[in-house]
Amino acid sequence: MQIILLDKVVNLGNLGDVVKVKDGYARNFLIPFGRARRATAAAIKEFEVKRAELEKAAAAKLAEMQVQGEKLGGTTVKLTQKAGVDGRLFGSVTNADIAQEVTKQGFAVSKSQIRLPNGPIKTVGDHAINIALHTDVVVDITVTVYGETA
């Protein structure tokens, strides 16, 4: 299916690109989430009329996320979990736990934006993680996990 991208999509293209994707990807993800439209002649003409407005909105969103990224970058998040004497956690710290704690600190972050390079955190100590605020804005923060013995 040919589609017009209304937003930058990772590994696919930028705003305004006409790309061919599988029908299911377009129908079930890109179009319902407002990231793309079918590439009909009428849709292409309509997009060209709105192109400057969409680019301006995308640039404003990027600038806003860069400002938030500068504030959030280098932040340390402290979590306490039950752990054994050897420093291994009973369970793990997931991206949902981290997103909840970052949100408590005043930053609007969803769990889908948290990137755990080594999977869920299962040990006590400092761990470096990434937060993807925007496709072009990824910040590094430190998660410190303290063990709590029962």
Swiss-Prot record:
GO terms for molecular function: rRNA binding; structural constituent of ribosome. Binds to the 23S rRNA. It comes from the Bacteria. Pfam families: Ribosomal_L9_C, Ribosomal_L9_N. This is Large ribosomal subunit protein bL9. It comes from Polaromonas naphthalenivorans (strain CJ2). InterPro entries: Ribosomal_bL9, Ribosomal_bL9/RNase_H1_N, Ribosomal_bL9_bac/chp, Ribosomal_bL9_C, Ribosomal_bL9_C_sf, Ribosomal_bL9_N, Ribosomal_bL9_N_sf. Belongs to the bacterial ribosomal protein bL9 family. GO terms for cellular component: ribonucleoprotein complex; ribosome. One of its GO terms (biological process) is translation. Keywords: Ribonucleoprotein, Ribosomal protein, RNA-binding, rRNA-binding.
